[in-house]
């Protein structure tokens, strides 16, 4: 085979040699490949037979003669397997120059998606037990989706094994190195006896995976600061909740529960004179200012009629104080508006009763106010149930 295909031949030269077919070169190469292929099937059958014999080794007799016959039979099977392996190894060694052209063949445009990997670099040994090893190369190609060209790595054969009954496979020494107790263990039963341990003998240098960046450790000072911030936020939230809760409870306790009679007694004039409407509309401000001026005239007339500086309307002042305390623009509710309007109505009724009981010297000055009070009474007698409230803007109220 060396005369047909020299060692270190290139792919282009091999293609030229096979194309010319001088001295039947192509036929000889095909014959050598077929001979190596024909050795594979008998080797597999003989190896399966050996495994079956080793699996049934305990089922035969235990006499000395039976043991000797069993030993000789197993020895013959091992020697036959050894001869088969040596024959196949010789054929593969002869085809080694042809295998060396595989990496170049995979680099061509038509074969980039293919891969070839020689798992068992076999070689023969001489009668002294030393392996006769040629420069066999192991081809390993790894194809990736991103790479357009394959990556090939060629390394020389590993150190040969100097055991008489081994096939110079470097995997056996690797197995003994990784598992030093394998030779001390007893024989195993079942089909595991005689089964060789197949390892990937590719000598391609493994690519170390990049290490993940280590996360920065959080110092104790940073942890303490984070805990202090969390505690401060919790305290602020607790203080806000405690401040807002008593105000809401006191407001709810101070508000009276309106009854149907109280709601029916509310007049539109009293509602229009509330502080809320005075703030929102200029009409309400003018009305409230006129009411305040009239109230001042009434108080002056009462002061002149009584002849002393004492204020007879003590109930009015006492009623104005809770009204001002309950007035809070941030807590305006319909119940508060009704309560304020009812207090104003009650004060006007008390003022009218006191004016009727006491003499009024300034009749002309109070005539306008009496007319206004009489008009308020007429409006108070209106029935709100018969009013058209569909045109009112309830959102504004």
Swiss-Prot record:
InterPro entries, per this entry?
A: Med3
Biased composition, class Polar residues, residue ranges: 166-178, 189-202, 290-303
Q: Which residues carry this modification: N-acetylmethionine?
A: 1
Location in or out of the cell? Nucleus
Spell out the Low complexity composition-biased ranges.
147-165, 309-322
Further details from the record: Present with 556 molecules/cell in log phase SD medium.
Q: What does this protein do?
A: Component of the Mediator complex, a coactivator involved in the regulated transcription of nearly all RNA polymerase II-dependent genes. Mediator functions as a bridge to convey information from gene-specific regulatory proteins to the basal RNA polymerase II transcription machinery. The Mediator complex, having a compact conformation in its free form, is recruited to promoters by direct interactions with regulatory proteins and serves for the assembly of a functional preinitiation complex with RNA polymerase II and the general transcription factors.
GO biological process annotations for this chain's record?
A: cellular response to heat; negative regulation of transcription by RNA polymerase II; positive regulation of transcription by RNA polymerase II; positive regulation of transcription elongation by RNA polymerase II; positive regulation of transcription initiation by RNA polymerase II; RNA polymerase II preinitiation complex assembly
Please give one Gene Ontology molecular function term for this protein: RNA polymerase II core promoter sequence-specific DNA binding
| Record's compositionally biased regions (Basic residues) | 211-223
GO CC annotation terms, alphabetical: core mediator complex; mediator complex; nucleus
UniProt similarity note: Belongs to the mediator complex subunit 3 family.
Keywords in alphabetical order, please.
Acetylation, Activator, Nucleus, Transcription, Transcription regulation
Highest taxon in the source lineage: Eukaryota
The record's subunit annotation is:
Component of the Mediator complex, which is composed of at least 21 subunits that form three structurally distinct submodules. The Mediator head module contains MED6, MED8, MED11, SRB4/MED17, SRB5/MED18, ROX3/MED19, SRB2/MED20 and SRB6/MED22, the middle module contains MED1, MED4, NUT1/MED5, MED7, CSE2/MED9, NUT2/MED10, SRB7/MED21 and SOH1/MED31, and the tail module contains MED2, PGD1/MED3, RGR1/MED14, GAL11/MED15 and SIN4/MED16. The head and the middle modules interact directly with RNA polymerase II, whereas the elongated tail module interacts with gene-specific regulatory proteins.
Q: What is this protein called?
A: Mediator of RNA polymerase II transcription subunit 3
For the region Disordered, give the residue spans.
Answer: 147-227, 288-327, 346-370
Main localisation: nucleus
Q: Keyword Cell wall biogenesis/degradation, does the record have it?
A: no
């Amino acid at each position: 085979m060396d005369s047909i295909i020299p060692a270190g031949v290139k792919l282009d030269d091999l293609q030229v040699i096979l194309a010319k077919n001088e001295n039947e070169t192509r036929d000889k190469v095909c014959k050598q490949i077929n001979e190596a292929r024909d050795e594979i099937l008998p080797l597999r059958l003989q190896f399966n037979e050996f495994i079956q014999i080793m699996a049934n080794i305990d089922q035969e007799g235990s006499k000395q003669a039976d043991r000797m016959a069993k030993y000789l039979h197993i020895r013959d099977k091992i020697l036959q397997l050894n001869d088969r392996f040596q024959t196949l190894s010789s054929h593969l060694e002869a085809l080694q120059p042809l295998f060396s052209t595989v990496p170049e063949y995979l680099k061509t445009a038509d074969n980039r998606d293919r891969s070839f990997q020689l798992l068992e670099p076999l070689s023969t040994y001489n009668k002294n037990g030393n392996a006769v090893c040629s420069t066999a190369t192991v081809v390993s190609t790894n194809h990736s989706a991103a790479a357009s060209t394959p990556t090939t790595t060629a390394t020389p054969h590993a150190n040969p094994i100097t055991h008489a009954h081994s096939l110079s496979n470097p995997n056996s020494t690797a197995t003994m190195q990784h598992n030093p107790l394998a030779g001390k263990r007893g024989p195993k039963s079942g089909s595991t006896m005689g089964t060789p341990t197949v390892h990937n003998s590719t000598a391609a240098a493994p690519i170390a995976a990049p290490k993940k960046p280590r996360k920065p450790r959080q110092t104790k000072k940073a942890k303490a600061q984070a805990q202090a911030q969390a505690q401060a936020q919790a305290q602020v939230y607790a203080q806000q909740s405690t401040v807002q809760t008593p105000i809401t409870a006191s407001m709810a306790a101070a508000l009276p529960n309106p009854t149907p009679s109280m709601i029916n007694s509310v007049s539109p004039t009293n509602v229009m004179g509330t502080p809320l409407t005075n703030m929102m509309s200029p009409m309400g401000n003018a009305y409230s200012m006129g009411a305040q001026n009239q109230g001042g005239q009434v108080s002056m007339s009462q002061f002149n009629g009584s002849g002393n500086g004492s204020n007879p309307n003590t109930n009015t002042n006492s009623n104005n104080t809770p009204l001002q305390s309950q007035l809070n623009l941030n807590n305006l509710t319909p119940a508060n508006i009704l309560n304020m309007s009812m207090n104003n109505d009650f004060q006007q009724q008390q003022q009218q009763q006191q004016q009727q009981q006491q003499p009024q010297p300034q009749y002309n000055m109070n005539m306008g106010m009496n007319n206004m009070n009489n008009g308020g009474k007429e409006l108070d007698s209106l029935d709100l149930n018969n009013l058209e409230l569909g045109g009112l803007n309830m959102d504004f109220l």
